[in-house]
C-alpha cells in the first residue's frame, strides 16, 4: 500500500457554551489545565513561544503561536521531544443558540508512510479526548482526567 496524500488529523465537537468562553478556555492555561495539559507557561499570544507540560507523563511541547483571531481561530506550530513541528488550527464557529462548534486540525506530519499514519491517528484520538474533556469541564464543571487516564501506566510507576 502506498500513501498518496499525507494524513491530516481532525476532531470536532459542539460545545454548549458561548464562543468567547470556549475560545478563552484554550487561550488561558489556568483553564486549559483543567481538561488537557497540567501546566502552561503563559497565555497564547501571537509570536510568543509557550511550553505546555503533561507532568504525569514527563513530556512537554514547545508551542509557537502563529495567529489568533479572537473568538474565531488559533493557529500554532508545536513539537514534542525535539520532533519536527506540525501545525494545529482551532476554528470556533458560534451558533445562533449560543453554542460553539469547535474544529481542531493538525497537519504536517512527517516520516515514512506507517509513521505518518500512526501520528495522525494518535493525534486525532488525542484531540477527540481534548474536546470531550473541554465539553465536560465547560458544560458540567467536571474534570474527566482524560489525558492521564487514557494511559495510566505511561509514567512507568505502575
Predicted regions mapped to residue ranges:
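Residues at helix-coil transition
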Residues: 27-28, 70, 132, 139-140
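Hydrophobic pocket/interface hotspot
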Residues: 22-26, 32, 50, 65, ...
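Glycine-rich portal/gate segments that line the openings of hydrophobic small-molecule binding cavities
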Residues: 34, 39-80
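Beta-strand/loop substructures that line and gate deep hydrophobic ligand-binding cavities in soluble
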Residues: 81-129, 145-147
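Hydrophobic/aromatic beta-strand elements that line small-molecule binding cavities or substrate pockets
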Residues: 13, 62-67, 87-94
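Short, highly charged C-terminal tails/helix-capping segments
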Residues: 136-158
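Hydrophobic ligand-binding cavity/cleft-lining segments
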Residues: 1-41, 158
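Intrinsic-disorder/low-complexity, polar/charged segments enriched in Ser/Thr/Lys/Arg/Asp/Glu/Gln
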Residues: 6-12, 49, 60, 73, ...
Amino acid at each position: 500500500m502506498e500513501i498518496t496524500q499525507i494524513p491530516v488529523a481532525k476532531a470536532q465537537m459542539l460545545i454548549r457554551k458561548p464562543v468567547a468562553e470556549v475560545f478563552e478556555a484554550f487561550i488561558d492555561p489556568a483553564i486549559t489545565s483543567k481538561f488537557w495539559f497540567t501546566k502552561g507557561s503563559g497565555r497564547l499570544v501571537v509570536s510568543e513561544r509557550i511550553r505546555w507540560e503533561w507532568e504525569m507523563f514527563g513530556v512537554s511541547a514547545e508551542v509557537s503561536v502563529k495567529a489568533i483571531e479572537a473568538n474565531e481561530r488559533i493557529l500554532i506550530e508545536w513539537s514534542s521531544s525535539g520532533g519536527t513541528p506540525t501545525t494545529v488550527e482551532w476554528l470556533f464557529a458560534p451558533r445562533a443558540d449560543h453554542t460553539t462548534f469547535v474544529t481542531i486540525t493538525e497537519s504536517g506530519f512527517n516520516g515514512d508512510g506507517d509513521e505518518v499514519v500512526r501520528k495522525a491517528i494518535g493525534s486525532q484520538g488525542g484531540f477527540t479526548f481534548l474536546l470531550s474533556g473541554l465539553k465536560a469541564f465547560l458544560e458540567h464543571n467536571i474534570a474527566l482526567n482524560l489525558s492521564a487516564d487514557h494511559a495510566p501506566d505511561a509514567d512507568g510507576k505502575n
